[in-house]
Amino acid sequence: MTAQQAPKWYPSEDVAAPKKTRKAVRPQKLRASLVPGTVLILLAGRFRGKRVVYLKHLEDNTLLVTGPFKVNGVPLRRVNARYVIATSTKVSVEGVNVEKFNVEYFAKEKLTKKEKKEANLFPEQQTKEIKTERVEDQKVVDKALLAEIKKTPLLKQYLSASFSLKNGDKPHLLKF
């Protein structure tokens, strides 16, 4: 007798059964060096070379970071973990409330078809205004972070200075 017996009724036409996927959506595992409060160096984008404070890991596998804006002009923003270098410098983020920041907070507003057409007709009139809510949130986070930053001497100057490599610098030998 075989391990699996043939079915009693068999269809005249063979129907291909779809393959079962064995992939599952799992949360990203971050590097051990990426802990909230770590000072990171941004490697790409508008703020490349800036030192920022890591606040939180978001659901879309991005990192929530801030300059603070008052120190080096980097606002609250999402960054891919691939484009940062973690330094050994840490800042306490216990007093910073980051519960309200999630993927929806950073989502772009969807435009209707009519609004899209108007935006395409007059591209020079497009100026993106910053929501007052975002500005207020930035001020609250900055205030809490600056209180912690001031406790460490020269940390404010360190965060305001940008990172770059000079001729002869060997990045694989640098200790961040």
Swiss-Prot record:
Localization: Cytoplasm
Record Gene3D superfamilies: 2.30.30.30
Pfam families attached to this UniProt entry: Ribosomal_L6e
GO MF entry, a single one: RNA binding
Keywords per UniProt: Cytoplasm, Isopeptide bond, Phosphoprotein, Ribonucleoprotein, Ribosomal protein, Ubl conjugation
Modification Phosphoserine occurs at: 12
Sites of the Glycyl lysine isopeptide (Lys-Gly) (interchain with G-Cter in ubiquitin) crosslink: 128
Biological-process GO terms, alphabetical: cytoplasmic translation; ribosomal large subunit assembly
GO CC terms in record: cytosol; cytosolic large ribosomal subunit
Positions of region (Disordered): 1-22
Broad class of where this protein is predominantly found: cytoplasm
PANTHER family documented for this protein: 60S RIBOSOMAL PROTEIN L6, LARGE RIBOSOMAL SUBUNIT PROTEIN EL6
Function description: Component of the ribosome, a large ribonucleoprotein complex responsible for the synthesis of proteins in the cell. The small ribosomal subunit (SSU) binds messenger RNAs (mRNAs) and translates the encoded message by selecting cognate aminoacyl-transfer RNA (tRNA) molecules. The large subunit (LSU) contains the ribosomal catalytic site termed the peptidyl transferase center (PTC), which catalyzes the formation of peptide bonds, thereby polymerizing the amino acids delivered by tRNAs into a polypeptide chain.
Misc: Present with 38400 molecules/cell in log phase SD medium. There are 2 genes for eL6 in yeast.
Subunit architecture: Component of the large ribosomal subunit (LSU). Mature yeast ribosomes consist of a small (40S) and a large (60S) subunit. The 40S small subunit contains 1 molecule of ribosomal RNA (18S rRNA) and 33 different proteins (encoded by 57 genes). The large 60S subunit contains 3 rRNA molecules (25S, 5.8S and 5S rRNA) and 46 different proteins (encoded by 81 genes).
Family, per entry: Belongs to the eukaryotic ribosomal protein eL6 family.
Name of the protein: Large ribosomal subunit protein eL6B
Organism, scientific name: Saccharomyces cerevisiae (strain ATCC 204508 / S288c) (Baker's yeast)
Name of the gene this protein is made from: RPL6B
